[in-house]
Amino acid sequence: MARCRRRSGCTAGAALLLLLALALSGGGGAAPQGAEVTGLPGFDGALPSKHYAGYVTVDEGHGRNLFYYVVESERDPGKDPVVLWLNGGPGCSSFDGFVYEHGPFNFESGGSVKSLPKLHLNPYAWSKVSTMIYLDSPAGVGLSYSKNVSDYETGDLKTATDSHTFLLKWFQLYPEFLSNPFYIAGESYAGVYVPTLSHEVVKGIQGGAKPTINFKGYMVGNGVCDTIFDGNALVPFAHGMGLISDEIYQQASTSCHGNYWNATDGKCDTAISKIESLISGLNIYDILEPCYHSRSIKEVNLQNSKLPQSFKDLGTTNKPFPVRTRMLGRAWPLRAPVKAGRVPSWQEVASGVPCMSDEVATAWLDNAAVRSAIHAQSVSAIGPWLLCTDKLYFVHDAGSMIAYHKNLTSQGYRAIIFSGDHDMCVPFTGSEAWTKSLGYGVVDSWRPWITNGQVSGYTEGYEHGLTFATIKGAGHTVPEYKPQEAFAFYSRWLAGSKL
């Protein structure tokens, strides 16, 4: 019945039933009181669709609260898919996606480090065709927090459980979206978040958890998956991209026998060290983008961590306002892919990852008026917003994601694995290899996919609704580098069309 309020043409009987439901429930399917965002500092004019934001408490006893920001679809929010977006890290805020990738606005720097950015409508926002939920997860990330600091010791499985609890409570708050198709999407370390959360959602559906979520599938971009596939992807990628010579590649291939990330043989170790030195000057998030190299590296404090001053230089993307100077998701050094046990914070591995800064997002999200407008706790209450935090003690305890992908797709849940083909952080070579390893038959042979008459990448379709796709010229965060192409494959895939 809540659907009827979104569209004209309701029958008199339906309208009467709606009024009765509203009278009995005190609001029916409406969003929770006080959740609507009516305006945003830095943006002039009416919002292009309804926005909502706030907290969902996933543990009352500990006061563990997850922050969300919802952007209703600009097309038909009553029917369009609902998509939960998760950034990676672990420990990185999903406002990364909102500000720098596929949110409703393009952010233009205000001119100085702390000045309020100007917001302009993004013609390639994913909210053009879907309702987006941006979730900061787990607690301690972005604007999410807990009153019990022990909650900041967490891992894959606990994060998935909390995120599932969030979803069940969120759909209770927004029941008008229960019949919409629901998808989970993310990038980088969300290559772990997405399948583990999808597994929890499916398990909940099968176990009778209420409300019943209309889960249809998931999306993973340049995502972490498996220690062996991820760890061995970089050397073939570097060779294919012309970063290392045939001779160097053959030396590594012969001495390492394909096991590049866990070199134990002396000759293999020498070969890998040579490759590391050759690629060390590149922007790992997009090998085409520039990096600043200073003769003397100065150190700057960020919270309780130290980062080289060289992380402050500007790269370029296809965004109209090139305000992003930090490409941050998760940069795994060649010999340190995700494996069982504690995952180092991004600050601990950052010394090998140049080209970093996030002043625009920080200036906006730490502005008192913005915090008030989006119903977030103040800086004085929960601290400043950080793109990626180091307060978590995070454990990778879910193992390889291959079994998760196999289980989900074999049950009929659609999936697309997409990769920016110039990302050296999580190279497409690894994603393509593990996708093939699932053993599904090919139903749409490898071919280019087209946007505006131009090749935008390559794709291959498999049985059980599985699709693999590359995005030509894109880096680690695909919608940031190639917003138009990203919107094209996203909208086509959601609609069930071929890329």
Swiss-Prot record:
It is an enzyme of class 3 (hydrolase). Its EC number is 3.4.16.5. PROSITE patterns: CARBOXYPEPT_SER_HIS (PS00560), CARBOXYPEPT_SER_SER (PS00131). Residues 1-30 form the signal peptide. It catalyses: Release of a C-terminal amino acid with broad specificity. Pfam families: Peptidase_S10. One of its GO terms (biological process) is secondary metabolic process. GO terms for cellular component: extracellular region. InterPro entries: AB_hydrolase_fold (IPR029058), Peptidase_S10 (IPR001563), Ser_caboxypep_his_AS (IPR033124), Ser_caboxypep_ser_AS (IPR018202). A motif (Microbody targeting signal) lies at residues 497-499. It is found in: Secreted. Keywords: Carboxypeptidase, Disulfide bond, Glycoprotein, Hydrolase, Protease, Secreted, Signal, Zymogen. Residues 297-351 form a propeptide. GO terms for molecular function: acyltransferase activity, transferring groups other than amino-acyl groups; serine-type carboxypeptidase activity. Glycans are attached at N148, N262, N407. The linker peptide is endoproteolytically excised during enzyme maturation. Disulfide bonds join C92-C388, C256-C268, C291-C355. The active site is at S188, D423, H476. Carboxypeptidase I is a dimer, where each monomer is composed of two chains linked by disulfide bonds. Belongs to the peptidase S10 family. May be involved in the degradation of small peptides (2-5 residues) or in the degradation of storage proteins in the embryo. This is Serine carboxypeptidase 1. It comes from Hordeum vulgare (Barley).
